[in-house]
Every structure is written in C-alpha cells, then in structure tokens.
Amino acid sequence: TNAYLYGTRFITWLAYNWSPEHVVDWAKRDDGSHRSYRKDFERVFGQPLDDAWQEWIAFEREFQGANLESVRTYPTTTYQALTPEALGSVSRTYIDEETRTLIAGFQYPGVIAHIGAIPVDGGKAEQLREIKGPALYQVVSIAWDPESRTIFYTTDNYEYRDIIALDRDTGKEEVLLKDARIGDLAFNRADKSLWGIRHLNGYASLVRIPHPYTEWNLVKSFPYGTVPYDLDISRDGQFLSTSVGDIRGKHSLQVHAIEDVLLDDFEPEQEVNFGDTLPEGFTFSPDGKYLFGSSFYTGVSNLFRIDVETGEFEAVSNAETGFFRPVPIDNETLLAYTFTGQGFMPVKLTATPLEDVSNIRSLGAQTIAKHRVLETWKAGSPDDIDAESRIVARDNYTAGGNLGLESMYPVVLGYKDSVSVGWKFNFSDHIMLDSLSIMGAHSVDSDLPTDERPNIMIDYKHTVVSASPLAGTWNFSYARNGADFYDLFGPTKRSRKGNRFTVGFEKTMLSDGPKSSSLLFNVNYFSDMDALPR
C-alpha cells in the first residue's frame, strides 16, 4: 500500500513540477523511447530517476510541513490513548456498556483478523472470534444488540457475505443468512430488526431483516450509481441515517424517518451535502439529537457534529493525522480512532464545537491549478457510447469458434542433455473459456537420433459452463519428445522420448475460502517411450 501511495504522489509531483505531458510521454512506448523505464525517464525529464526521487522527497517534506503549520494555526485537539499501540485496520465500533469495552473487528500484522473487545479504561484486548474472509480496511460489517448481547457480523466480505450472530458472553455462534450479500449492518432496538445494504448486479438496495433473522425484505432499490453506506439507527428506532454517493461522485448525509421509509417514502427529513468529500461513519448520539462522524472536508479527516433537527454542521476536532469512526458516549465525549503509521489507535476526546479549522493544500488541486489542461482530461460517460452501433454480430457464442492468436514468442528448451530452439503460439477466445497452445522446437544436437530432434507439444483447454455433471475444465494434450526449459539447468530431467496423449478434467466441488475442494483426474497413453530411470 505504501509503495502504491508513494508512487501516486511521485507521479503527481512530476506532473506538477514538469507537466502532465511529460508524464504521458514517459508512460508511452513510441518511436525514440527506451525499453528501460529508468533510461526513458532520463530522456523525458533530463535527469536520472534517483535524483528526481530525492528531489520529490525534499519537496514532500516542505509541502507537508506547510500543511501541518496550517493545521496548527488553531489549537489541535488533544486526546487520551486507550491502548499502548495501534490496532491496524478497524471496523465500525460499539460500546458494550455492561463490560465497558469497545466491540469491533480488528486486523493487524501478525494476528488473524477477529472480532475483539477493548477495555475503555485501558487494559488487555480480548479476541472473541476469528473473522472468515475479512476486508482489508473496513475489516467487517458489524452491529450490536445490547439487550440480547449479540454481535452481528459478516464473513466472506469480498464475496457473497454470510451474516453471523455471536453471543458476546458464551461465544456461541450461529449462521443467520448464507450468501446474503448484505453489509453496512445497523440494529434497530425498537423492533430488534437488522438493516443493511445489499449489492447485486451493480445495484444497491436497502433491506430489512426482521427477528428472528431468517429472511430479508427489500425496502428500496436505488438507481444505478447511487450507493448508500454507513447506516445507523437512532436508539428510539425513529430515524435512519445513511451516507449516499451518486454516480457523479457527490456525497451527502441523509436522515430518514423509518416510518416513512417503510411506506416507500424516501424523502429525507434532513440532508447535508458534502460535495466530493465522503461523510464517513456517522452515528447517532445516545439521545438522538446529534450525528457524529468524520470527513476530509478540510483536507484532514476531522470529526463533525450535525444537529438532526436543524442540520447545523460543526467541526469538533482539529487533527493533524486524522480522526475516524467516532463513538458518542454523550453529546460532549467521544471515543474515536486516530491514524498512525501502524494503523488506527483508539482514543478518548472532548467534542467541543470549533469556530475555525484550517484547510490544507492538496497536491492534486495545486497541479490542476498550475496546469489547466488537466481540467479537460476527463473520462467520458458510458452514456455517450452507442452500444448498439458496436455490435458486429448476433449469434450464440462458442468459445472454440472464437479462438484467436493471443501471443507468439521464441523458446529455448532442454531435451535430455541437448538444447532445442523453437516457437510457442498461444490462442484463446475473447472471454478466456478456451485456450490452445502449440509449441514446436528442434534440437541443435546433431548427435541425437533423427526421430528425437523434433519437439512438439500441444495443449487445449475447454471450459464447459452449464449445470450438467460435465461442467468444468477439460484438457486435451499431446507431446512428441516432450522438452522442458528447466532441463537446461538441473540434474532432474522431465524430457522424454516418445508420444504422450492426455485427457484431463478438473471441477471445483467446494469454494468457501479458506476451504476448497476439487475433483481432478488425468488419463494418459504413452507410446514409443524410453524406459524411465530407476
């Protein structure tokens, strides 16, 4: 991740310091360019890459130093750390008032992702349950029922998502819904229902899961490109809050009366527009009067308080590295997470409304301001493309009938103790159901018998997509004097004189990571073979 972030900043700095056209010229491979990215960098930018990298580091220190000075124009928010070290990635968090612990999903190096509990007053964290299939940054979608002391959370978070109920005290676990594809969980204390967002075929839907959680009911499907996230429900069960992003990249925080939502009225009672910045993790205060959450509204992730009745919007933190996922204890005290180089650290702070918070400079915005041509570099809308005009044929698709040349390249192989040279040709269809590779080579060793000098290897894979028992990947291959690249080096030889015909089949029987099961078999026929060495 750090390498990705550093690379992104470096490329942006190149565009800022030189021009966007320089960056494009370096990325292109046209006449006059060099195969080596380092050599081509020097051609385009007029200096070695390592020198430019050091210049960027010096620039970055100065740039970020100025940003920190801007933040410090006004007093920064003080806080009390709840743990001696950071906890990596963290999910939404709840307070278990009975045990005075924070309940959340955690994922950090050296420890398997898990549902855990952290004492609010300090102390050793407790691991409650490992998470199957955690997400990298959000970790897990989680909700909490304090009355039954049940933790609801999701597994397989990058796949179809199961919803699990975990008893906080006994550790007993139950799968409620399998492959439900529902996340962003929120619990309604008034009727003990679970709410969430279900994703399918590119569309997001608001769903309600009534007790005892055996089925979900559709509440509202949203237009394509409109995605609600970070649901929360007030303690009295009257209001639902959600952040909403639209297809233009604009975001808002909305508050809805649950009674109206259930009557198919999704007109918000309150809406606060955040523009291009995301409203994240907004949750109701215990009395339902406020919503607390975070946003990069000032360029740094600060905490904000929104009056549910009036929509008044106030900053309650001035952070240097950012605060995230606030948990209101009351209207003045928050538990939250501050960002460190090792991940998120839980902290306690006072939510005092601030009159002034400084913005910081964005390198991207500075680059656009300096090079106005970037304002015209925008991706077009898919709606601008006439899909019908691009259809070249209408027919049933057959993978074998759509095989085309994918690549071709020379090969060097080892055959016994000699060297063979030749070519390999790879073919595949447009959606990679079928593939064919043909490799032909000839030994340069004139001492080999004539019938052993040619090397031929043909491999064809055909994927059957259907509900029949024959669905799976079929493999048909033939080798004549099979040769292998690694026979050029090691004492173990895989090359063999003669013919080999193979029919193989592979079928996935179970795919439920980390568990998987496959059926695999191969039938081989050999002829004119040398005896294998003992």
What is each stretch, according to the model?
Residues E69, F106, S295, M345, ...:
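Outer-membrane beta-barrel initiation region
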Residues N2, W26-T150, D156, R168:
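Beta/coil-rich, acidic/histidine-enriched accessory regions frequently appended to metallopeptidases
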Residues E98-R100, E147-R149, A190-K192, D236-Q238, ...:
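Short coil/turn segments that connect the beta-strands within blades of beta-propeller domains
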Residues P119-G123, D167-G171, P210-T214, I258-V261, ...:
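Short loop/turn segments that connect beta-strands within beta-propeller blades
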Residues A86-G88, G105-G116, K132-Y137, Y153-I164, ...:
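A flexible loop/linker signature enriched in serine peptidases of the S9 family
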Residues T77-P84, E126-G133, K172-L177, W216-F222, ...:
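A short beta-strand motif characteristic of beta-propeller blades
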Residues A471-R534:
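Transmembrane beta-strand segments of outer-membrane beta-barrel domains in Gram-negative
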Residues Y94-I95, A143, A186, D232, ...:
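Conserved beta-strand position repeated across blades of beta-propeller domains
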